[in-house]
Regions:
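Active-site HxH/HxHxD metal-binding segment of metal-dependent hydrolases
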Residues: 40, 78-80, 84-195, 223-225, ...
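N-terminal amphipathic/basic leader segments beginning at the initiator methionine
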Residues: 13-42
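Residue-level signal for the nucleotide or nucleotide-sugar donor/cofactor binding architecture
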Residues: 111, 251, 332
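Metallo-beta-lactamase
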Residues: 67-78, 167, 171-179, 183-186, ...
Length: 385
């Protein structure tokens, strides 16, 4: 869960501590258009963002005749000021932008995609699921007195009050970063190889934070393997891994933890280039920290249910994060609490039932035979792969 949320938790046990510090081998660039060299033909810039997480890292990969951009920043004045500065920077040696790769669909990673593609005449590369989600999500929240039924079923079923549902909807209707998506794209698939300059980048796919998140990995230099990680691996925060109204039965934490297993196959010396915070080494240490973080959250939720009996997801959220006041933070936190509850159910640590009178789902510690699907009518046994 995000670090500002972690600070609001009231755990019953001591939170796990890192066994050794990560190493940050490169100083970050100044936000707003300055460039920092990471390796030959690999540059790092920071685009400011007017939110609590106040920047996004973008990277530029030199090809023979131009530069490939990784991620975009929010559709916002700060991005509109930064990108022309980057394009004119002497470090680019007069070469133009030639392509854009978006790791995933979230606004800070793809919000400027349409502008960049149109302004510089470049194509967009993404995975199919991320582009599809970009096209469906980059839409205004419906106006009018009636809230979308799926929104009400999911968050109302999680125990969010009618008053807070309205506050969340008002916040979403006022979203300042909504922007038309870039309609056309070129698909990236797991296992693809991108030849960019002297490097061969392998396309890796992660999931959990978003449906088909692209990471790029190059291990040609054993002394400096490189991973462009997006939001799949960040040094000090755990990316939001939520269940959403569009897929209310999802178990995204299983996908997230499976993606950590995939990242563990990479070289120990890998330089991790995340979308936020610093470039770091210590990949395997960080994946283990994240596993321990989620194990801690699982135990905290089960302890809470054992102490208080049945609770809705919203009640669990309020107990773990009592200081959250911003409607969007509460929305994200409810989705992530539901994700933790969903992950605990198949292993028999949590059960649920539907309260017909209140029209909410209540969770309790322990297993129960015959849990019915939250929103579906068919019981689906997950495949073992």
């Amino acid at each position: 869960m995000q670090d500002h949320q972690e600070n609001d938790s009231k755990p019953s046990k001591e939170r796990p501590r890192a066994s050794a510090p990560l190493v940050y081998p490169v100083e970050p660039p100044e936000p707003g258009g300055a460039l920092q060299r990471i390796a030959d033909g690999l540059l790092w810039a920071r685009i400011p963002m007017p939110i609590a997480l106040n920047h996004i890292n973008v990277y530029l990969l030199r090809d023979h005749d131009g530069w490939v951009i990784i991620d975009t920043g929010l559709q916002h004045e700060q991005s509109l000021l930064a990108w022309p500065k980057i394009a004119a920077a002497p470090e680019l040696e007069g070469l133009p932008f030639k392509a854009l790769i978006c790791t995933h669909f979230h606004y800070d990673h793809g919000g400027m995609a349409r502008w960049l593609c149109n302004t510089y005449g470049i194509p967009l590369y993404m995975s199919r699921a991320e582009h599809h989600t970009m096209r469906t999500n980059y839409q205004p929240f419906p106006a009018g007195p009636e809230l979308p039924p799926a929104f009400v079923r999911f968050y109302g079923g999680a125990g969010v009050s009618t008053e807070n549902l309205e506050k969340m909807a008002t916040f979403l209707r006022q979203d300042p970063f909504i922007t038309p998506p870039q309609e056309s794209y070129i698909r990236l698939r797991r296992g693809d190889t991108l030849s960019i300059g002297q490097r061969q980048w392998q396309v890796l796919i992660g999931s959990g934070h978003s449906p088909e998140h692209v990471c790029l990995y190059c291990d040609q230099d054993p002394a400096q393997p490189l991973l462009i990680a997006g939001d799949q691996l960040i040094s000090r925060i755990s990316s939001n891994v939520p269940v959403n109204p569009s897929e209310p039965e999802a178990n995204p934490l299983k996908d997230w933890l499976d993606s950590l297993d995939m990242l563990d196959t990479l070289a120990p010396k890998t330089w991790v280039m995340p979308a936020h915070q610093g470039v770091f080494t210590g990949l395997h240490l960080r994946t283990q920290e994240l596993r321990e973080h989620h194990a801690f959250q699982f135990d905290a939720i089960v302890d809470l249910l054992q102490q208080h009996g049945e609770m809705t997801a919203a009640q669990v959220m309020e107990a773990i994060f009592p200081k959250l006041r911003n409607p969007i933070d509460q929305l994200l936190a409810v989705g992530e609490v539901v994700a933790h509850l969903h992950h605990l159910m198949p292993v028999g640590r949590v059960r649920r039932r539907f309260d017909d009178a209140a029209q909410v789902y209540r969770f309790a510690a322990g297993a129960a035979a015959g849990d019915k699907p939250l929103f579906g009518v068919l019981r689906v046994q997950a495949a073992v792969v």
